Amino acid sequence: MTKMLKFLFKNKINVELSIKQYKLNLRNPFGTAHSVTTTRTNALIEIKVEDIRGFGECGLPPKKPLCYLADYNDIETYFNSWIKEIDEKQKQQQQQQEESYHYDAFNKISQKEYFKELRKEMNGDYQQSVYQFLFECLDNCKENSKDYSYASRCAIEMALLDGWGKFLKQPIYKLINIPESESLKPFYYTISMCPTMEEIMDSTDFGSKYTGFLKIKLDADVEKGMNIIDSVQKRLLNNNSTRTISKISVDANSSWTPSVARKYLEKLSPMADLISMVEQPFPIETLKTVNKDQKIDIQHLNEWVSIKKEYQDKGLLIFADESICTEKDLDGLVQLVHGVNIKLEKTGGIRPGLSTLLKAKELGLKTWIGSMVASSLNVSAAAHLLCSLSDFGGDLDGGLLIDDATQLFENDAFQLLDNGLIKMNSNNYGVGVTLKK
Protein backbone atom coordinates (compact mmCIF):
# COMPACT_ATOMS: atom_id res chain seq x y z
CA MET A 1 0.00 0.00 0.00
CA THR A 2 1.27 3.46 -0.93
CA LYS A 3 1.64 6.04 1.86
CA MET A 4 1.65 9.70 0.88
CA LEU A 5 2.01 13.28 2.14
CA LYS A 6 1.10 16.41 0.16
CA PHE A 7 1.97 19.96 1.20
CA LEU A 8 2.62 23.45 -0.15
CA PHE A 9 6.15 24.78 0.45
CA LYS A 10 6.22 28.53 1.17
CA ASN A 11 2.63 28.60 -0.07
CA LYS A 12 4.05 28.36 -3.58
CA ILE A 13 5.50 24.92 -4.43
CA ASN A 14 3.43 21.72 -4.56
CA VAL A 15 5.20 18.74 -3.00
CA GLU A 16 4.11 15.09 -2.85
CA LEU A 17 6.01 12.36 -0.98
CA SER A 18 5.19 8.67 -1.20
CA ILE A 19 6.53 5.23 -0.31
CA LYS A 20 5.49 1.81 -1.57
CA GLN A 21 6.77 -1.74 -1.82
CA TYR A 22 8.88 -2.53 -4.88
CA LYS A 23 8.55 -6.28 -5.45
CA LEU A 24 11.21 -7.89 -7.61
CA ASN A 25 11.38 -11.40 -9.09
CA LEU A 26 14.88 -12.76 -9.69
CA ARG A 27 16.04 -14.45 -12.90
CA ASN A 28 17.72 -17.20 -10.87
CA PRO A 29 17.74 -18.02 -7.15
CA PHE A 30 20.25 -15.66 -5.52
CA GLY A 31 22.33 -17.61 -3.05
CA THR A 32 25.05 -16.52 -0.64
CA ALA A 33 26.75 -18.32 2.22
CA HIS A 34 23.89 -17.23 4.52
CA SER A 35 20.66 -17.14 2.43
CA VAL A 36 18.91 -18.03 -0.83
CA THR A 37 16.12 -15.86 -2.25
CA THR A 38 13.99 -15.86 -5.40
CA THR A 39 12.15 -12.58 -4.72
CA ARG A 40 12.93 -9.33 -2.96
CA THR A 41 10.71 -6.60 -1.51
CA ASN A 42 12.54 -3.30 -1.73
CA ALA A 43 11.28 0.18 -0.84
CA LEU A 44 10.50 2.76 -3.53
CA ILE A 45 10.33 6.46 -2.62
CA GLU A 46 8.87 9.13 -4.90
CA ILE A 47 9.30 12.86 -4.29
CA LYS A 48 7.32 15.07 -6.65
CA VAL A 49 8.10 18.80 -6.67
CA GLU A 50 5.64 20.53 -9.00
CA ASP A 51 5.93 18.35 -12.14
CA ILE A 52 9.39 16.88 -11.44
CA ARG A 53 9.41 13.33 -10.09
CA GLY A 54 12.43 12.04 -8.19
CA PHE A 55 12.77 8.35 -7.33
CA GLY A 56 14.81 6.46 -4.76
CA GLU A 57 15.17 2.76 -3.96
CA CYS A 58 16.86 0.80 -1.22
CA GLY A 59 17.70 -2.88 -1.63
CA LEU A 60 16.56 -4.98 1.33
CA PRO A 61 18.31 -8.36 1.65
CA PRO A 62 17.29 -10.79 4.42
CA LYS A 63 18.24 -9.28 7.76
CA LYS A 64 21.62 -10.23 9.19
CA PRO A 65 22.94 -8.93 12.56
CA LEU A 66 25.59 -6.20 12.36
CA CYS A 67 25.16 -5.89 8.59
CA TYR A 68 21.73 -5.96 6.94
CA LEU A 69 19.51 -4.17 9.42
CA ALA A 70 16.28 -3.13 7.71
CA ASP A 71 13.17 -4.60 6.11
CA TYR A 72 10.30 -2.80 4.39
CA ASN A 73 8.38 -2.21 7.63
CA ASP A 74 11.45 -0.45 9.06
CA ILE A 75 11.69 1.81 6.00
CA GLU A 76 8.01 2.67 6.31
CA THR A 77 8.46 3.49 10.02
CA TYR A 78 11.31 5.83 9.13
CA PHE A 79 9.33 7.44 6.30
CA ASN A 80 6.44 8.18 8.68
CA SER A 81 8.86 9.79 11.14
CA TRP A 82 10.38 11.88 8.34
CA ILE A 83 7.02 13.23 7.17
CA LYS A 84 6.18 14.05 10.80
CA GLU A 85 9.41 16.07 10.95
CA ILE A 86 8.38 17.82 7.73
CA ASP A 87 4.93 18.64 9.11
CA GLU A 88 6.39 20.13 12.31
CA LYS A 89 8.99 22.13 10.38
CA GLN A 90 6.32 23.43 8.01
CA LYS A 91 4.28 24.76 10.95
CA GLN A 92 7.36 26.52 12.36
CA GLN A 93 8.03 28.14 8.98
CA GLN A 94 4.46 29.37 8.69
CA GLN A 95 4.66 30.98 12.14
CA GLN A 96 7.99 32.67 11.36
CA GLN A 97 6.78 33.81 7.93
CA GLU A 98 10.34 34.02 6.60
CA GLU A 99 10.56 34.36 2.84
CA SER A 100 14.12 33.07 2.36
CA TYR A 101 15.33 29.61 3.26
CA HIS A 102 18.79 28.03 3.26
CA TYR A 103 20.27 24.76 4.52
CA ASP A 104 23.64 23.28 3.55
CA ALA A 105 22.82 19.58 3.22
CA PHE A 106 26.45 18.80 2.45
CA ASN A 107 28.20 20.43 5.41
CA LYS A 108 29.41 17.08 6.77
CA ILE A 109 31.52 16.54 3.65
CA SER A 110 34.72 18.33 4.61
CA GLN A 111 35.97 18.88 1.07
CA LYS A 112 33.95 21.92 0.05
CA GLU A 113 34.40 21.38 -3.69
CA TYR A 114 31.87 18.54 -3.61
CA PHE A 115 28.22 19.53 -4.20
CA LYS A 116 29.50 23.10 -4.51
CA GLU A 117 26.48 24.51 -6.36
CA LEU A 118 23.91 22.85 -4.10
CA ARG A 119 25.42 24.38 -0.95
CA LYS A 120 24.58 27.94 -2.01
CA GLU A 121 21.71 30.14 -0.90
CA MET A 122 18.99 29.91 -3.53
CA ASN A 123 17.85 33.56 -3.23
CA GLY A 124 14.14 32.98 -3.59
CA ASP A 125 14.40 30.00 -5.94
CA TYR A 126 11.79 28.02 -4.03
CA GLN A 127 11.90 25.02 -6.35
CA GLN A 128 15.51 24.46 -5.25
CA SER A 129 14.97 25.62 -1.66
CA VAL A 130 12.40 22.86 -1.17
CA TYR A 131 15.12 20.23 -1.71
CA GLN A 132 17.27 21.92 0.95
CA PHE A 133 14.24 21.94 3.25
CA LEU A 134 13.56 18.22 2.71
CA PHE A 135 17.24 17.43 3.28
CA GLU A 136 17.17 19.34 6.58
CA CYS A 137 14.15 17.34 7.73
CA LEU A 138 15.92 14.14 6.68
CA ASP A 139 19.08 15.06 8.59
CA ASN A 140 17.05 15.93 11.71
CA CYS A 141 14.70 12.95 11.60
CA LYS A 142 14.25 11.48 15.09
CA GLU A 143 14.77 7.94 13.76
CA ASN A 144 18.34 8.66 12.63
CA SER A 145 19.74 6.98 15.74
CA LYS A 146 18.13 3.65 14.75
CA ASP A 147 20.25 1.05 12.98
CA TYR A 148 17.66 0.67 10.21
CA SER A 149 17.80 4.36 9.37
CA TYR A 150 20.75 4.00 6.98
CA ALA A 151 18.85 2.14 4.25
CA SER A 152 15.89 4.50 4.74
CA ARG A 153 18.01 7.61 4.37
CA CYS A 154 19.65 6.10 1.29
CA ALA A 155 16.33 5.77 -0.57
CA ILE A 156 15.03 9.22 0.43
CA GLU A 157 18.31 10.97 -0.38
CA MET A 158 18.41 9.21 -3.77
CA ALA A 159 14.94 10.53 -4.62
CA LEU A 160 15.92 14.05 -3.54
CA LEU A 161 19.08 14.10 -5.66
CA ASP A 162 17.25 12.52 -8.59
CA GLY A 163 14.63 15.27 -8.56
CA TRP A 164 17.14 18.06 -7.95
CA GLY A 165 19.33 16.81 -10.79
CA LYS A 166 16.35 16.65 -13.15
CA PHE A 167 15.40 20.22 -12.23
CA LEU A 168 18.94 21.44 -12.96
CA LYS A 169 19.29 19.13 -16.00
CA GLN A 170 22.43 17.56 -14.54
CA PRO A 171 23.41 13.95 -13.75
CA ILE A 172 24.24 13.33 -10.10
CA TYR A 173 27.99 12.96 -10.65
CA LYS A 174 28.01 16.50 -12.04
CA LEU A 175 25.99 17.72 -9.06
CA ILE A 176 28.65 16.14 -6.85
CA ASN A 177 31.25 17.96 -8.96
CA ILE A 178 33.41 14.94 -9.68
CA PRO A 179 34.86 14.53 -13.17
CA GLU A 180 34.32 11.27 -14.97
CA SER A 181 37.56 9.30 -14.75
CA GLU A 182 39.59 8.91 -17.92
CA SER A 183 40.08 5.23 -17.08
CA LEU A 184 36.79 3.33 -17.36
CA LYS A 185 35.91 1.00 -14.49
CA PRO A 186 34.87 -2.67 -14.76
CA PHE A 187 31.34 -3.97 -14.24
CA TYR A 188 31.15 -7.28 -12.37
CA TYR A 189 28.28 -9.73 -12.75
CA THR A 190 27.48 -11.89 -9.71
CA ILE A 191 27.28 -15.66 -10.07
CA SER A 192 25.53 -16.57 -6.86
CA MET A 193 25.35 -19.88 -5.02
CA CYS A 194 22.29 -21.21 -6.82
CA PRO A 195 20.85 -24.49 -5.52
CA THR A 196 22.02 -26.46 -8.59
CA MET A 197 25.08 -26.38 -10.85
CA GLU A 198 22.74 -26.07 -13.84
CA GLU A 199 21.42 -22.77 -12.43
CA ILE A 200 24.98 -21.59 -11.78
CA MET A 201 25.85 -22.33 -15.41
CA ASP A 202 22.70 -20.54 -16.61
CA SER A 203 23.77 -17.52 -14.59
CA THR A 204 27.27 -17.76 -16.10
CA ASP A 205 25.85 -17.83 -19.63
CA PHE A 206 23.65 -14.81 -18.94
CA GLY A 207 26.24 -12.68 -17.16
CA SER A 208 29.05 -13.37 -19.62
CA LYS A 209 26.94 -11.80 -22.39
CA TYR A 210 27.53 -8.46 -20.68
CA THR A 211 30.98 -8.62 -19.12
CA GLY A 212 34.13 -10.65 -18.63
CA PHE A 213 34.37 -9.51 -14.99
CA LEU A 214 32.67 -12.10 -12.79
CA LYS A 215 31.99 -12.19 -9.06
CA ILE A 216 31.61 -15.76 -7.75
CA LYS A 217 30.03 -16.44 -4.37
CA LEU A 218 31.54 -19.31 -2.36
CA ASP A 219 31.01 -20.78 1.09
CA ALA A 220 33.33 -22.71 3.42
CA ASP A 221 33.27 -25.89 1.29
CA VAL A 222 36.62 -25.54 -0.50
CA GLU A 223 36.16 -28.50 -2.85
CA LYS A 224 32.73 -27.27 -3.96
CA GLY A 225 34.00 -23.70 -4.30
CA MET A 226 36.92 -24.60 -6.53
CA ASN A 227 34.63 -26.81 -8.59
CA ILE A 228 32.37 -23.80 -9.20
CA ILE A 229 35.31 -21.62 -10.30
CA ASP A 230 36.63 -24.40 -12.56
CA SER A 231 33.17 -25.06 -14.03
CA VAL A 232 32.62 -21.37 -14.80
CA GLN A 233 35.95 -21.18 -16.63
CA LYS A 234 35.28 -24.38 -18.60
CA ARG A 235 31.77 -23.24 -19.48
CA LEU A 236 33.06 -20.18 -21.28
CA LEU A 237 35.76 -22.18 -23.06
CA ASN A 238 33.46 -25.02 -24.12
CA ASN A 239 30.79 -22.64 -25.39
CA ASN A 240 33.35 -21.14 -27.77
CA SER A 241 32.34 -17.82 -26.27
CA THR A 242 33.90 -14.69 -27.67
CA ARG A 243 33.96 -13.52 -24.07
CA THR A 244 37.00 -14.41 -21.99
CA ILE A 245 37.21 -13.96 -18.24
CA SER A 246 39.02 -10.71 -17.50
CA LYS A 247 38.94 -10.96 -13.69
CA ILE A 248 37.20 -12.96 -10.98
CA SER A 249 36.16 -11.60 -7.59
CA VAL A 250 35.64 -14.30 -4.95
CA ASP A 251 32.97 -13.44 -2.37
CA ALA A 252 32.89 -15.52 0.83
CA ASN A 253 30.14 -13.50 2.56
CA SER A 254 31.88 -13.81 5.96
CA SER A 255 31.67 -17.63 5.93
CA TRP A 256 35.30 -18.78 6.27
CA THR A 257 37.38 -19.76 9.27
CA PRO A 258 41.13 -19.11 9.29
CA SER A 259 41.68 -22.77 8.41
CA VAL A 260 39.31 -22.54 5.42
CA ALA A 261 40.96 -19.29 4.29
CA ARG A 262 44.36 -20.99 4.22
CA LYS A 263 42.98 -23.96 2.26
CA TYR A 264 41.49 -21.59 -0.29
CA LEU A 265 44.81 -19.72 -0.44
CA GLU A 266 46.55 -22.89 -1.61
CA LYS A 267 44.03 -23.28 -4.42
CA LEU A 268 43.68 -19.63 -5.42
CA SER A 269 47.33 -18.53 -5.36
CA PRO A 270 48.22 -20.26 -8.68
CA MET A 271 45.54 -18.13 -10.36
CA ALA A 272 46.38 -14.91 -8.51
CA ASP A 273 46.66 -12.95 -11.76
CA LEU A 274 43.01 -13.77 -12.48
CA ILE A 275 41.65 -12.96 -8.99
CA SER A 276 40.95 -9.27 -8.42
CA MET A 277 40.05 -9.74 -4.75
CA VAL A 278 38.66 -12.05 -2.07
CA GLU A 279 35.68 -10.40 -0.39
CA GLN A 280 34.91 -10.74 3.31
CA PRO A 281 36.44 -14.12 4.16
CA PHE A 282 36.35 -13.35 7.91
CA PRO A 283 33.21 -13.28 10.11
CA ILE A 284 31.62 -9.90 10.85
CA GLU A 285 32.14 -10.69 14.54
CA THR A 286 35.92 -10.42 14.05
CA LEU A 287 35.60 -6.69 14.76
CA LYS A 288 31.99 -6.27 15.95
CA THR A 289 29.78 -7.89 18.56
CA VAL A 290 25.99 -8.09 18.77
CA ASN A 291 26.19 -7.68 22.55
CA LYS A 292 28.00 -4.46 23.48
CA ASP A 293 29.27 -6.05 26.69
CA GLN A 294 30.93 -8.85 24.72
CA LYS A 295 34.64 -8.48 24.01
CA ILE A 296 36.42 -9.02 20.70
CA ASP A 297 38.41 -12.27 20.51
CA ILE A 298 41.93 -10.82 20.11
CA GLN A 299 43.52 -14.18 19.24
CA HIS A 300 40.96 -14.70 16.47
CA LEU A 301 41.51 -11.13 15.24
CA ASN A 302 45.28 -11.57 15.13
CA GLU A 303 44.92 -14.74 13.10
CA TRP A 304 43.03 -12.83 10.43
CA VAL A 305 45.67 -10.08 10.55
CA SER A 306 48.21 -12.78 9.69
CA ILE A 307 46.01 -14.12 6.90
CA LYS A 308 45.94 -10.68 5.27
CA LYS A 309 49.73 -10.82 4.98
CA GLU A 310 49.71 -14.43 3.76
CA TYR A 311 47.29 -13.51 0.97
CA GLN A 312 49.28 -10.39 0.14
CA ASP A 313 52.48 -12.42 -0.14
CA LYS A 314 50.76 -14.61 -2.76
CA GLY A 315 49.51 -11.62 -4.75
CA LEU A 316 45.91 -11.74 -3.49
CA LEU A 317 43.92 -8.86 -2.00
CA ILE A 318 41.29 -9.09 0.74
CA PHE A 319 38.34 -6.67 0.75
CA ALA A 320 35.72 -6.04 3.43
CA ASP A 321 32.02 -6.08 2.58
CA GLU A 322 29.70 -7.04 5.45
CA SER A 323 32.13 -5.47 7.96
CA ILE A 324 32.07 -2.02 6.36
CA CYS A 325 28.91 0.00 6.91
CA THR A 326 30.01 3.59 7.54
CA GLU A 327 33.29 5.47 7.65
CA LYS A 328 33.47 4.76 11.40
CA ASP A 329 34.33 1.14 10.55
CA LEU A 330 37.37 1.98 8.42
CA ASP A 331 40.07 2.51 11.06
CA GLY A 332 39.62 -0.96 12.52
CA LEU A 333 39.57 -2.63 9.11
CA VAL A 334 42.96 -1.35 7.94
CA GLN A 335 44.72 -4.18 9.77
CA LEU A 336 42.53 -6.83 8.10
CA VAL A 337 41.97 -5.77 4.51
CA HIS A 338 43.47 -4.12 1.47
CA GLY A 339 40.20 -2.54 0.36
CA VAL A 340 36.51 -2.03 1.06
CA ASN A 341 33.21 -2.57 -0.76
CA ILE A 342 31.00 0.50 -0.24
CA LYS A 343 27.21 0.12 -0.51
CA LEU A 344 24.83 3.07 -0.32
CA GLU A 345 22.25 1.30 1.85
CA LYS A 346 24.87 0.65 4.52
CA THR A 347 26.48 4.11 4.52
CA GLY A 348 23.14 5.93 4.43
CA GLY A 349 23.26 7.25 0.87
CA ILE A 350 25.43 9.10 -1.62
CA ARG A 351 26.62 11.84 0.78
CA PRO A 352 27.96 9.49 3.50
CA GLY A 353 29.01 7.06 0.76
CA LEU A 354 31.21 9.80 -0.69
CA SER A 355 32.68 10.58 2.75
CA THR A 356 33.40 6.88 3.34
CA LEU A 357 35.15 6.56 -0.03
CA LEU A 358 37.28 9.64 0.61
CA LYS A 359 38.32 8.47 4.06
CA ALA A 360 39.13 4.97 2.75
CA LYS A 361 41.48 6.52 0.22
CA GLU A 362 43.11 8.64 2.93
CA LEU A 363 43.80 5.43 4.87
CA GLY A 364 45.39 3.80 1.82
CA LEU A 365 42.54 1.35 1.22
CA LYS A 366 41.42 0.34 -2.27
CA THR A 367 37.78 1.01 -3.13
CA TRP A 368 34.98 -0.88 -4.83
CA ILE A 369 31.29 0.03 -5.20
CA GLY A 370 28.73 -2.69 -4.57
CA SER A 371 24.97 -2.92 -4.82
CA MET A 372 22.18 -4.90 -3.23
CA VAL A 373 19.76 -6.92 -5.33
CA ALA A 374 17.77 -4.02 -6.74
CA SER A 375 16.51 -2.45 -9.93
CA SER A 376 18.43 -0.25 -12.36
CA LEU A 377 17.30 2.80 -10.34
CA ASN A 378 19.37 1.77 -7.35
CA VAL A 379 22.47 0.58 -9.19
CA SER A 380 22.49 3.65 -11.44
CA ALA A 381 22.68 5.85 -8.34
CA ALA A 382 25.76 3.95 -7.15
CA ALA A 383 27.38 4.35 -10.58
CA HIS A 384 27.75 8.10 -10.02
CA LEU A 385 30.35 7.39 -7.31
CA LEU A 386 31.89 4.42 -9.09
CA CYS A 387 32.71 6.36 -12.26
CA SER A 388 35.47 8.36 -10.58
CA LEU A 389 36.05 7.17 -7.03
CA SER A 390 36.22 3.37 -7.30
CA ASP A 391 39.61 1.79 -7.88
CA PHE A 392 38.28 -1.65 -8.82
CA GLY A 393 34.90 -0.87 -10.37
CA GLY A 394 31.98 -2.70 -8.83
CA ASP A 395 29.15 -5.19 -9.03
CA LEU A 396 26.35 -2.93 -10.26
CA ASP A 397 24.47 -5.92 -11.65
CA GLY A 398 21.27 -5.63 -9.63
CA GLY A 399 19.25 -4.64 -12.69
CA LEU A 400 20.41 -7.79 -14.50
CA LEU A 401 19.60 -10.09 -11.58
CA ILE A 402 15.88 -9.28 -11.67
CA ASP A 403 13.48 -10.15 -14.48
CA ASP A 404 12.29 -7.54 -16.95
CA ALA A 405 8.63 -7.81 -15.93
CA THR A 406 9.25 -6.41 -12.43
CA GLN A 407 11.74 -3.76 -13.57
CA LEU A 408 9.96 -0.38 -13.41
CA PHE A 409 12.78 1.71 -14.89
CA GLU A 410 14.80 1.88 -18.10
CA ASN A 411 17.68 3.84 -19.65
CA ASP A 412 20.44 3.23 -17.09
CA ALA A 413 22.78 6.01 -15.98
CA PHE A 414 25.60 4.09 -17.66
CA GLN A 415 26.25 1.94 -20.68
CA LEU A 416 28.29 -1.24 -20.77
CA LEU A 417 30.98 -1.32 -23.42
CA ASP A 418 31.88 -4.60 -25.14
CA ASN A 419 34.77 -5.28 -22.78
CA GLY A 420 32.57 -4.95 -19.68
CA LEU A 421 33.65 -1.44 -18.77
CA ILE A 422 31.24 1.26 -17.57
CA LYS A 423 30.71 4.56 -19.38
CA MET A 424 28.38 7.15 -17.85
CA ASN A 425 25.55 8.63 -19.92
CA SER A 426 26.07 12.35 -19.32
CA ASN A 427 22.77 13.29 -21.00
CA ASN A 428 20.64 11.38 -18.48
CA TYR A 429 19.68 13.71 -15.63
CA GLY A 430 19.42 12.96 -11.92
CA VAL A 431 20.01 9.28 -11.22
CA GLY A 432 19.75 8.75 -14.96
CA VAL A 433 16.84 6.33 -15.36
CA THR A 434 13.29 6.88 -16.58
CA LEU A 435 10.05 5.30 -15.50
CA LYS A 436 8.73 2.77 -18.02
CA LYS A 437 5.59 3.87 -19.83
UniProtKB/Swiss-Prot annotation:
EC number(s) stated in the UniProt entry for this protein: 5.-.-.-
Enzyme active site: K217, D395
Record's signal peptide: none
Coiled coil regions in record: none
GO molecular function: metal ion binding; racemase and epimerase activity
Residues that hold Mn(2+) according to the record: D251, E279, D321
One biological process term in Gene Ontology: peptide metabolic process
InterPro entries linked to this entry: DgoD-like (IPR034593), Enolase-like_C_sf (IPR036849), Enolase-like_N (IPR029017), Enolase_C-like (IPR029065)
Lineage top rank: taxon: Eukaryota
Entry keyword set: Isomerase, Manganese, Metal-binding
Similarity section: Belongs to the mandelate racemase/muconate lactonizing enzyme family.
Protein name (record): Enolase superfamily member DDB_G0284701
Organism: Dictyostelium discoideum
